[in-house]
Design a protein with these regions (language model features):
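A short, well-structured beta->alpha microelement
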Residues: 26-43
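A short acidic, amphipathic alpha-helical/loop segment
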Residues: 18-19, 40-43, 63-65
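Cofactor-binding loop segments of dinucleotide-utilizing enzymes, especially the Rossmann-like FAD-
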Residues: 8-10, 33, 81
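Short glycine-rich, flexible loops that bind phosphorylated cofactors or substrates
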Residues: 58-60
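Ser/Thr/Gly-rich flexible loops in soluble cytosolic domains mediating phosphotransfer, phosphorylation
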Residues: 69-97
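Redox- and metal-dependent alpha/beta enzyme cores, enriched for Fe-S-associated oxidoreductases
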Residues: 1-24, 39
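Alpha-helix C-terminal capping/helix-to-coil transition sites in glycosyltransferase folds
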Residues: 45-47
Length: 97
């Protein structure tokens, strides 16, 4: 059950990566969203899920990420930087295993 997750926003992820590993994520990447070049070059898009920490990124980046995710058919969730906020929004097939 290989799963890759891209987290956009926030500098310190705290327990989030550890919790994601528990539900099967083994490839976790993080872009803080401060560096515009990353966004211009494009996100690493071969991901199974994108988590946007919306309290840490600007509106423009949120929209760009959303658009790219939609084009690539990748599920995207917008959450605060807390595991409970993320967990509540995860696709059901991830939380029911």
């Amino acid at each position: 059950n290989n799963m890759s997750v891209l987290i956009v926003g926030g500098d310190h992820l705290g327990s989030i990566p550890k919790e994601l590993k528990k539900i099967g994520a083994d490839d976790i990447r993080h872009v803080s969203g401060r560096n515009r070049n990353v966004i211009k070059r494009g996100m690493p898009m071969a991901m199974d899920l994108i988590i946007v920490l919306h309290d840490f990124i600007n509106h423009n980046l949120a929209n760009v990420t959303k658009k790219q995710a939609k084009e690539c058919n990748i599920p995207i969730i917008f959450a605060k930087r807390s595991w409970s906020s993320i967990y509540k929004k995860l696709p059901h097939h991830l939380t029911n295993n």
